[in-house]
A protein has these predicted regions:
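Flexible, gly/pro- and Lys/Arg-enriched active-site loops
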Residues: 3-7, 11-172
Length: 172
């Protein structure tokens, strides 16, 4: 058993206007971000809301998928269902302990991010340097509560619509 409980980490791609979604999808295309997401979440439990699961279309391989929903009839093939954040995090902690990993990855959506933010210790943030139309937004962070510990800037490319930065924030 790992004596240190796993860190709760948010994984979010956010535009300059705090946009994170449009019509259940990302409002941009960044292949590099998809590869980064896969790299940082692989082997770790991922927790998401029902709408995020539906937008993915399937459970993501190589990770324990936990879906939060109040709809007790909803079925997410290949995922563990949880009907509260507390239940979902308890399942994620067990999965992290069994896998020997030190992070629980929260991957969305808007309501899940907002609810879990007070418990989060780390944020893997992809800053998308654009301001697209959106209908889903990320919570405004209090800059006094977070410090940047990593930044890697990228120019747009053939499979990346916009310039972007990979940023890691740690709670102060």
């Amino acid at each position: 058993m790992n004596p240190t409980p796993p860190v709760i980490a948010l994984v979010v791609a956010m535009a300059e206007n705090r946009a994170i979604g449009l019509g259940g999808n990302l409002p941009w295309h960044l292949s590099s971000d998809m590869r980064y997401f896969r790299k940082i979440t692989m082997g770790k439990p991922i927790v998401m809301g029902r709408l995020t699961f539906k937008s993915l279309g399937r459970a993501l391989p190589g990770r324990v998928n936990i879906v939060l929903t109040r709809d007790r009839d909803f079925v997410a093939p290949g995922a563990i269902m949880a009907h509260s954040l507390a239940e979902g995090l308890a399942q994620a902690r067990r999965a992290a302990e069994e896998a020997g990993v030190d992070e629980i990855m929260i991957i969305g959506g808007e309501d899940v991010f907002r609810e879990v933010l007070p418990e989060a210790r780390r944020i893997y943030l992809t800053e998308v340097h654009a301001a697209p139309e959106a209908d889903t937004w990320f919570h405004q962070l209090d800059g006094r509560e977070w410090r940047e510990v990593f930044r890697e800037d990228h120019a747009p490319g053939p499979k990346d619509d916009h310039p972007f930065s990979f940023v890691v924030l740690e709670r102060t």
